[in-house]
């Protein structure tokens, strides 16, 4: 007869009317009993012939692709002018005095952040924007391009200009070596008074026939300032600063993506000073002489008259011919849905390319991408805005993968010890937290995103046309991409983007200037950054509490008024560092803080309401006696595991599920096991804060007997049959707790000390978890353990009781670090004197 739920509860000693613990508990360690129960509950029957169930409620297999929905009305979020102050360490010093070693180390990690992959795989530009929404290809293309353009304008991306240079918007950092109109500006590291040392050497950017001569000049200019050699020094030295043949030129040198159809080299001097203004298309009448002013770095405007007419004309034709969009102007419409009609809507489509305010040298950057991008909803609650997903997963795969640094996250108990108090709480929202941290330009060639331009993107996705060879294109295959769908999409998009359609239809390659989200390094760097900042804040306001996890920052203070003044002070400090907060999203929690999925109050910690609801729904949908795919079980365990510490039996109750996932076999819920789990998760108990205290109760065991020392009283007992040492140590700890009721027990067994009971016999683990709930353990070396003698059957010998103080841990969060701490070889774990026990000190 299968085991009923009531019998199973009795067996696990969850009911009060169980017999004496010393007799009942050792039975649960018996292998035979565990095996029989597993068979009764159908836990061991892994090989099933019935087809597996692949969906339970909302849970599908871990890797099943839930198809995201595309929203044509997505708004691109705006990014404030985020610029983290470069002298952040000095700013913190002014705020709090000398920094501790830890804080300094963490802040140096991100100023600037560096990224060293083992191998970088370059992908063709066509893979830049992922065809994630086959129904909305063109729409998605333009929305993504607009998002990337917004990021570039906000100074979060570099734009690749040539193989060795990039441009960006926003304020430059001292490690970004600036080039101005083809010159390298060498700067010293201090950037405050702009006392940068700028020798006026002329380094023409593109590789030119006068290579050695210019390189030697650059080499000299590193040694010291030289006489200014005029704006066109490169040309005066006997040779034309020619741009690499056949690439349409702009005042910025080569764009480096689209080859132009004019085959000859342009001999105009437009790499060191500007020849034509950005795009020759703006001037409808191609005048033989073009004049344009451009401010040189020294401040005087250089006018360039009388450029030979043939060169200016060849350039203007080159830029029109190389521009897929504008070519439609000179062609005949192929149908009523021809792009010719859209291109002729307005005369001035603006420039073919935009350039940033600053231009810097970069390592060699190929015209490729290293990761694809696509758009999704910003979050489940906000579907009106989009979020860019960047896939740099190549760095986490294969045998060349980067092993990302590990970092400490406080576990549930440490978090409760730290935050469970009667403080008032408030949480801050850092807007675009990842985009605060600057990356070194050397990382740019590894983190490239972009697109191959609309023509190739459409050609790649439409089945009837080949990818056009830009070099030898005829008017006919220019029109290959015309279609009704494209025409309709572009007409609608024209309302949104206007003449930007032209700009966005060009190819572009962008590298990250701030850390992107799709790289495993980013969460680590963000965690280091926010924890260092919070550490500084905690030391500046010792009577308050500041804590962070990733971009989630919480502040706690004794009273609401106090909290508001703390909020004002901390906000000003963060703004002075260049950290952008979102004041609309500041949440005031009162006395129970919502943080990391938990509700934390003075009574302890519980999971948030939405998680409890999810668990209830999960049990409602959970089928009985049907094998469930182990990938779905992974999902179920993920949800139940989060709330396991709040149940009677904890993690051990989920062990049968873990076992089936490890064996990659389907799992079948028997009615009893489902009822047992359901009951477990109906009543959740808070995890309470551990209190410091003196340990008075000790437990010890040998394979045949156990012994307790409770105050001056000694007890001993024997087991019917010898048991493994870890099992008997756990039994002894359970007896000590049930006999004395003490919440603090001394033991010499590391497994019991760890409070992970998942490796014990299943029934024993479940029962022990309930008996030892809320118990703290202190380590006692065996030689000093007063319960050692009774466990060996010797009651007469007394070892003196130890005075063992217990201090609850707060993980790696040192709350009261002395300013500036003297680093000892092994730092003590810093004691968290709760704000409850510390008399309030004025700031």
UniProtKB/Swiss-Prot annotation:
Name of the protein in question: Protein P
Region of interest: Spacer: 178-346
Highest rank taxon of the organism: Viruses
Bias (Low complexity): 223-235
PANTHER family: PEPTIDASE A2 DOMAIN-CONTAINING PROTEIN-RELATED (PTHR33064:SF29), POL PROTEIN (PTHR33064)
Regulation: Activated by host HSP70 and HSP40 in vitro to be able to bind the epsilon loop of the pgRNA. Because deletion of the RNase H region renders the protein partly chaperone-independent, the chaperones may be needed indirectly to relieve occlusion of the RNA-binding site by this domain. Inhibited by several reverse-transcriptase inhibitors: Lamivudine, Adefovir and Entecavir.
Keywords: DNA replication, DNA-binding, DNA-directed DNA polymerase, Endonuclease, Host-virus interaction, Hydrolase, Inhibition of host innate immune response by virus, Inhibition of host RLR pathway by virus, Magnesium, Metal-binding, Multifunctional enzyme, Nuclease, Nucleotidyltransferase, RNA-directed DNA polymerase, Transferase, Viral immunoevasion
Job of this protein: Multifunctional enzyme that converts the viral RNA genome into dsDNA in viral cytoplasmic capsids. This enzyme displays a DNA polymerase activity that can copy either DNA or RNA templates, and a ribonuclease H (RNase H) activity that cleaves the RNA strand of RNA-DNA heteroduplexes in a partially processive 3'- to 5'-endonucleasic mode. Neo-synthesized pregenomic RNA (pgRNA) are encapsidated together with the P protein, and reverse-transcribed inside the nucleocapsid.
Organism: Hepatitis B virus genotype B2 (isolate Indonesia/pIDW420/1988)
Site feature location: Priming of reverse-transcription by covalently linking the first nucleotide of the (-)DNA: 63
Family stated for the protein in its record: Belongs to the hepadnaviridae P protein family.
Entry-linked SUPFAM superfamilies: DNA/RNA polymerases
Residues covered by region (Disordered): 221-240, 289-315
Signal peptide segment: none
Keyword Nucleotidyltransferase: yes
Record region (Terminal protein domain (TP)): 1-177
GO BP terms in the entry: DNA replication; symbiont-mediated suppression of host innate immune response
The reaction(s) this protein catalyses: DNA(n) + a 2'-deoxyribonucleoside 5'-triphosphate = DNA(n+1) + diphosphate; Endonucleolytic cleavage to 5'-phosphomonoester
Binding, Mg(2+): 429, 551-552
Gene transcribed to yield this protein: P
Alphabetical list of HAMAP family matching this protein: HBV_DPOL
EC number: 2.7.7.7, 2.7.7.49, 3.1.26.4
């Amino acid at each position: 007869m299968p085991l009923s739920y009531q019998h199973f509860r009795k067996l696990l000693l969850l009911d009060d009317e169980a017999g004496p613990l010393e007799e009942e508990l050792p039975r649960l360690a018996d292998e035979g009993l565990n095996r029989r129960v597993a068979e009764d509950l159908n836990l061991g029957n892994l090989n099933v012939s019935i087809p597996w169930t692949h969906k339970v409620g909302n849970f599908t297999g871990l890797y099943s692709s839930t198809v995201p929905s595309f929203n044509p009305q997505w708004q691109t979020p705006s990014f404030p002018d985020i610029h983290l102050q470069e002298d952040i360490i000095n700013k913190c010093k002014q705020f709090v005095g000398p920094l501790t070693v830890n804080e300094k180390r963490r802040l140096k990690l991100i100023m600037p952040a560096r990224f060293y992959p083992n191998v970088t795989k370059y992908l063709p530009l066509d893979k830049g924007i992922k065809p994630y929404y086959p129904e909305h290809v063109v729409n998605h293309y333009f929305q993504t391009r607009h998002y990337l353009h917004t990021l570039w304008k906000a100074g979060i991306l570099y734009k690749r200009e040539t193989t060795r240079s990039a441009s960006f918007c926003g304020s430059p950092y001292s490690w970004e070596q600036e080039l101005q109109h083809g010159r390298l500006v060498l700067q010293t590291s201090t950037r405050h008074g702009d006392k940068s040392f700028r020798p006026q050497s002329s380094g023409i950017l593109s590789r030119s026939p006068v290579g050695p001569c210019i390189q030697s000049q650059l080499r000299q200019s590193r040694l010291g300032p030289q006489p200014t050699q005029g704006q066109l020094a490169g040309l005066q030295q006997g040779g034309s600063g020619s741009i690499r043949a056949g690439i349409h030129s702009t005042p910025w040198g080569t764009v480096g993506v689209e080859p132009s159809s004019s085959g000859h080299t342009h001999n105009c001097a437009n790499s060191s000073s500007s020849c034509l203004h950005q795009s020759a298309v703006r001037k409808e009448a191609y005048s033989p002489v073009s004049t344009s002013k451009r401010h040189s770095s020294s401040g005087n405007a250089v006018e360039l008259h009388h450029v030979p007419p043939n060169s200016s004309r060849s350039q203007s034709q080159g830029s029109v011919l190389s521009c897929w969009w504008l070519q439609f102007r000179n062609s005949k419409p192929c149908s009523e849905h021809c792009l010719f009609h859209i291109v002729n809507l307005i005369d001035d489509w603006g420039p073919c390319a935009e350039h940033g305010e600053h231009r810097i040298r970069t390592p060699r950057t190929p015209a490729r991408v290293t990761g694809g991008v696509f758009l999704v909803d910003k979050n489940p609650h906000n579907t009106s805005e989009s979020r860019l997903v960047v896939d740099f997963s190549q760095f986490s795969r294969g045998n060349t993968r980067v092993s990302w640094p590990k970092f400490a996250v406080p576990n549930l108990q440490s978090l409760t010890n730290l935050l469970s108090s009667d403080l008032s709480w408030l949480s801050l929202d850092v807007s675009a937290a990842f985009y605060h941290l600057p990356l070194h330009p050397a990382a740019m060639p590894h983190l490239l995103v972009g697109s191959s331009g609309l023509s190739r993107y459409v050609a790649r996705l439409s089945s009837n046309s080949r990818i056009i060879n830009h070099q030898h294109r005829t008017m006919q295959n220019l029109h290959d991409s015309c279609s009704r769908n494209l025409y309709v999409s572009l007409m609608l998009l024209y309302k949104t983007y206007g003449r930007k359609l032209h700009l966005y239809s060009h190819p572009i390659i962008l590298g990250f200037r701030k850390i992107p989200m799709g790289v495993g390094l980013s969460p680590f760097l963000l965690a280091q950054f926010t924890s260092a900042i919070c550490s500084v804040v905690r030391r500046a306001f010792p009577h308050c509490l500041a804590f962070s996890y990733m971009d989630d920052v919480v502040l706690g203070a004794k009273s609401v008024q106090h909290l508001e003044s703390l909020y004002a002070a901390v906000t000003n400090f963060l703004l002075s560092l260049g950290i952008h907060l979102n004041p609309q999203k500041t949440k005031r929690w009162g006395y129970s803080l919502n943080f990391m999925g938990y509700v934390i109050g003075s009574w302890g910690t519980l999971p948030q309401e939405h998680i409890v609801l999810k668990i209830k729904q999960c049990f409602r949908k959970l089928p009985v006696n049907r094998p469930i795919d182990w990938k779905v079980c992974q999902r179920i365990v993920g949800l139940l595991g989060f709330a396991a510490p709040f149940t009677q039996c904890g993690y051990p109750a989920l062990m049968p599920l873990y076992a089936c996932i490890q064996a990659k076999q389907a799992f079948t819920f028997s009615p009893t096991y489902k009822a047992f789990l359901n009951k477990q998760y109906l009543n959740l108990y808070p995890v309470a804060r551990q209190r410091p205290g003196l340990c008075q109760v000790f437990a010890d065991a040998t394979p045949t007997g156990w012994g307790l020392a409770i105050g001056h009283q000694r007890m001993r007992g024997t087991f019917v049959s010898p048991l493994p040492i870890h099992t008997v140590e756990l039994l002894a700890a359970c007896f000590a707790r049930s006999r004395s009721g003490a919440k603090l027990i001394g033991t010499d067994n590391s497994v019991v000390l760890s409070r992970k009971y998942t490796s014990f016999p299943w029934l024993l683990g479940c029962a022990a978890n309930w008996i030892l709930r809320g118990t703290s353990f202190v380590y006692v070396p065996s030689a000093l353990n007063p319960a050692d003698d009774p466990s060996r059957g010797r009651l007469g010998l007394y070892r003196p009781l130890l005075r063992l103080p217990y201090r609850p841990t707060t993980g790696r969060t040192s709350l009261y670090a002395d300013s500036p701490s003297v680093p000892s070889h092994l730092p003590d774990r810093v004691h968290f004197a709760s704000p409850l026990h510390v008399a309030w000190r004025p700031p």
